[in-house]
Amino acid sequence: GSGHLPIFTGYVGQGLLDACAIGDVFASPSVDQMADAMREANGGAGVLRLYGNYGGDVMNFDMAGEMLEMEDVDSSTVLLADDVASASKQEREKRRGVAGMVYAFKIAGAAAEEMNNLNEVTRIAQKTADACHSVGAALTPCTVPQAGKPTFEISDDEMEMGMGIHGEPGVWRGKIKKADEIANEMIDMLLADMDLTSSSRVSVLVNSLGATPPEELYILYRIVKSRMEDVGAEIVMPLVGRYATSMEMTGVSFTFCELDSELEKLLKAPADCAFWKVG
């Protein structure tokens, strides 16, 4: 759905997405919209459907894929399920897809740009999805225009840890903490979900959920960098800014994407679109 700019339309471009289907704010696109986007993206080699793990999207994309099968268009699916707060590590298939989609779009797009076949691009996209781990924290809700009211209620002196990008409940709600405390708790959740070592190479995304300004994001990135140094892991190509938002929500999300040589090369490959930036 809309409401998350620059995801999704902002990442259509060379070395990234070929097309995207957009619904209303926080609503899945229709089956026809999805089928039209797949037709536009199809150059004869098939289409990878790459999106977050949400029921409405899954249902509609599955039906769109069936429509395209009748037109002899091959397609495959990779679901992002990177939100560590939404389900346990043992039930990863139940997790929501959040800002890890940025890495999947970039790396799978680079693989397609290299003229890999559909099976290979799908493999790389799934590998990227599996390598991504995300968590968010919010201080304010956002307002969906159709509803005309906030997606949830929260006091001015409260925050919610693990909040979803549509206002889904997090893991706890309580008094606002200092930036260092918030960041360290988020990092603890991500590190507990991963097996990083002194030889690990990780790209980190410090993402504004909408209203959080760059100055505050870089304060949080400082903490992420320090914690990675403690682990001994090396940060590769950090991303700081607005990459996947939730309307005007005040909040932040962290995504850690553990890289091997294959994923790192594709992440660093050239890309050109309105919103892709590094640093």
Give the ranges of each region predicted by the language model.
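Short, acidic/small-residue loops that bind anionic groups at enzyme active sites
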Residues: 20-25, 69-94, 230-235
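Short Gly/Thr/Asp-enriched flexible loops that form oxyanion-binding sites at enzyme active sites
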Residues: 58-72, 91, 216-222
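Internal, active-site/partner-interface "lid" segment
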Residues: 86-95, 105-166
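Gly-rich Lys/Arg/Thr-decorated short loops/hinges at beta-loop-alpha junctions or inter-strand turns
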Residues: 8-21, 85-88, 159-175
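Short glycine-rich or small-residue beta-strand-to-loop segments that form or flank ligand, phosphate
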Residues: 1, 17-20, 46-55, 62-65, ...
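Glycine-rich phosphate/diphosphate-binding loops and the adjacent beta-loop-alpha structural elements
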Residues: 149-219
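C-terminal non-catalytic interaction/assembly regions of soluble proteins
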Residues: 189-279
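Glycine-rich oxoanion-binding loops at beta->alpha junctions
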Residues: 4, 11-44, 191
